[in-house]
Amino acid sequence: MIVFLGVLGLLVWLEEKYSMDHVLDGLDFATALDKTVVEPGEDFSWTMTINNRKRLMVPYLQMREQIPAGLVFSENGENVAAKSSGDHLSVLYLKGCQKTELERRVLLKKRGRYFFRGVSAEAGDFLGLQTALETYPELKEIVVKPAPSGWEELPRLLGGYAGEYVVKRSLFEDPVLIRGFREYTGREPLRSISWVQSARQSRFLVKEQENMTDLSCTILLDVECRDEEREAELLEQCFSMVRSICEELEKQRIAYDFQTNGVIAGAMGNWNRIGEGLGPGHLETVLEGLGRMTYDCRMGSGEFLSGIRKGLRSGKSLI
């Protein structure tokens, strides 16, 4: 009997040691978002996939998902993050070779860039006496656009300025002058590609056209702010106003380009200008850039406007 108990104890100890040494082996964690750019308050799917690739079960698995501040559940509006840690806590049991997906519908209310930064996993051993901790870093980004400003006077202001032009354009066909060619960036419509020039140069080139009677507009966003206490509030209002102006220009079919002395961070690059264009793709590019903008300033207002004035094409003026 003593020998039997000794052998049983040895087997339990070996199983305990093996499970402790390998409890986190073969575990994979992956975060997935069904959208990369959203409106303020627009819900999106946030899915965590846990895959146990080994045959050994995981009797206790606690996950701490590192999530962005301000994330709330779509159904009830409750904060996703725990008050104590700021992370989202989940506890699971995994069978051997089991794959589990946790899908949540969530939303973010404020403009900006947000990051899901992976998981800290804590797993228990065979007897539940010890735990092992491992971090699985990850970086998933989502961008929230600025909200429209609700500027009620904007349609009237732009309508009065552009109304005469719209009437003339409906009566006469615009003469078009091709000024040259430039490299295709992916934002231009396919009809603007010059297939002859592209074949000659072995790369996509688009025509730079000048509509001789066409009205176009340059939107300038100056982010230099001297009121440090209200900087965030005032700049957020500016981002929303730029969005409303772009959307109104889209409604009136007026081509526009966008320039700023602000910093637009992230995957789009640190660009400061979007060329002249029109259409949903052009608008979405501007809105994503506004969502990515920080409160930093690349140059002062004087230097920014001076550079704009020097680069004006003939027929354009700075008001």
Language model region names:
Residues 68, 146-147, 174, 279, ...:
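Alpha-helix initiation/capping motif
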Residues 209-211, 248-250, 277-280, 308-312:
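Short, conserved, surface-exposed binding loops centered on an aromatic residue
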Residues 267-306:
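Short, charged loop segments at secondary-structure junctions
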Residues 1-8:
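Membrane-targeting alpha-helical segments
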Residues 172, 186, 291-295, 310-313:
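Generic surface-pattern signal
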Residues 303-319:
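Exposed acidic/Ser/Thr-rich ligand/metal-binding surfaces
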Residues 189, 254-257, 295-302, 317:
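Residue-level signal for secondary-structure boundary elements
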Residues 11-268:
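An amphipathic, basic-hydrophobic helix/alpha-beta surface used to engage anionic
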